[in-house]
Regions:
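Structured catalytic-domain cores with a bias toward divalent-metal coordination
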Residues: 17-425
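Bacterial Sec-dependent N-terminal signal peptides
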Residues: 1-23
Length: 425
């Protein structure tokens, strides 16, 4: 009887909290008037609630359910403009090549044509070739360098194989290892050259399948371990230990450990940008919902959800109280429509669960913003789960992972009608 009573109490508590969040969503989802970022004069009045929620945060993470969500790209572009023009953010960090996009950007002559050329080759084409991002890459960012308030670019992804890394990473790494006295710690000059060849093979594999041969695996693994140990012994605080860890993470063969290592590396790369490269700047993070999620270490474990929920960049990053206080994580949600990445087929997004958050948003809202931080303060950060299509375009059943999404994201940007992005002409 006692067990039944306890279970009943827990159920009642969860139900009450669920009713609280439903009422909160219905009453506090703020309409957003437009996704159009191209207006010459924009007073951003409809984004005032976003600005108020963000407050003095130094990091704002902008998610997306899939890398083929056209309206989400448009919304993020307008949010980038708003954060840059009204909230003092001066760096846009993409889920793209940490070494190539960051180092290459430093070397770049900041002229409109050269900026466009560089971005097309050092940010994933999922975005740079999208018609929904065209204004951002071809106009807004390049033109910002004709003003007194330029928007700088950086990357934080540990996948180092885009244009600049493909052309320069091996040579730059060789120069670094020689100058740091690490090259001569290899067993022989031949072993060192085998390591460099394996690094280049791994970088080239994505564009030239077969470039990373099976016989390169051991030289790469052994070399990365040697370099990492030497860096640790030397207390190296440069970006190179992060690059080495990124290559290691990218070289792991099993998908789940590789993705976990990737997210950990992305969090470390972002911290480096904030503490070293752009130590006085506010940074906008452009990534997938799946990477920016917080508190995923507190969610249930299980083989069915480990890849999509466990050990995420946002979780690693906000474990540090310093960054937890200075970060606002904005997830994206949608009701219906299609999605589809460039180069792939479009697909219909899953309908929301009848009891899901999407059905609590007032039906007349095409776009809306919902701030969870006010709800969490009002109800002492309730951890009762509720349903939401997230981090992707489907609802994770509660039997697999009951999730309090109000603790995973600080807020949500809602789009009623999603559309698959199209290639820029």
């Amino acid at each position: 009887m006692k067990t039944l009573t306890t279970a009943a109490c827990l159920l009642l508590c969860a139900t009450a909290c669920g009713q609280d969040i439903r009422s909160y969503v219905m009453a506090n989802t703020v309409p957003v008037a437009t996704l159009d970022a191209t207006a010459a004069a924009d007073d951003y009045a409809d984004l005032a609630a976003v600005g108020q929620a963000i407050g003095e945060a130094r990091v704002v993470m902008l998610g997306e359910q899939d890398h083929g969500d056209g309206p989400a790209f448009q919304a993020k572009t307008r949010l980038v403009k708003y954060l840059h023009e009204r909230k003092g953010f001066t760096v846009l960090a993409f889920e793209s090549d940490f070494y190539g996009l960051t180092t290459g950007w430093d070397q770049l002559a900041k002229q409109p044509d050269s900026i466009q050329y560089f971005l097309q080759r050092n940010i994933f084409s999922l975005w740079t070739r999208s018609a929904d991002c065209r204004y951002l890459f071809e106009q807004y960012i390049p033109q910002s360098f004709q003003t007194a308030n330029p928007l700088h670019l950086s990357g934080f992804d540990s996948q180092h194989y885009l244009g600049y890394s493909y052309l320069h990473l091996r040579t730059d790494l060789d120069r670094y290892l020689v100058s740091a006295g690490i090259a001569n710690q290899f067993p022989s000059p031949a072993a060192y050259q085998q390591f460099l060849a394996a690094v280049q093979g791994r970088i080239a594999e994505m564009r030239t399948p077969g470039a990373f041969r099976p016989d390169m695996r051991k030289p790469l693994k052994d070399g990365l371990q040697l370099v990492s140990q030497a860096q640790l012994a030397a207390h190296d605080t440069s970006a190179w230990p992060l690059v080495i860890e990124g290559i290691r993470a990218f070289s792991l063969e099993e998908r789940v450990p590789s993705e976990w290592a990737r997210d950990k590396a992305m969090a470390d790369n972002l911290k480096f940008l904030l503490t070293t490269r752009y130590k006085d700047a506010k940074i906008i993070v452009w990534a997938a919902n799946q990477h920016i999620m917080k508190r995923t270490d507190q969610l249930p474990k299980g083989q069915k959800v480990d890849l999509i929920l466990r050990n995420k960049m946002g979780t690693y990053f906000t474990r540090d109280p310093q960054w937890a206080k200075q970060t606002y994580v904005l997830g994206f949600a949608s009701y219906q429509g299609t999605s589809g990445r460039l180069g792939g087929a479009s697909y219909p997004v899953q309908a929301p669960d009848q009891h899901g958050l999407e059905n609590w948003v007032p039906k007349g809202l095409a776009y809306g913003f919902l701030d969870f931080t006010a709800y969490n303060k009002q109800f002492n950060s309730p951890s009762a789960p509720f349903l939401l299509k997230s981090p992707s375009h489907y609802t994770i059943p509660a039997r697999f992972a009951p999730i309090p999404w109000n603790l995973v994201y600080d807020g949500l940007f809602f789009i009623r009608e999603m559309q698959a992005t199209k290639k820029s002409e």
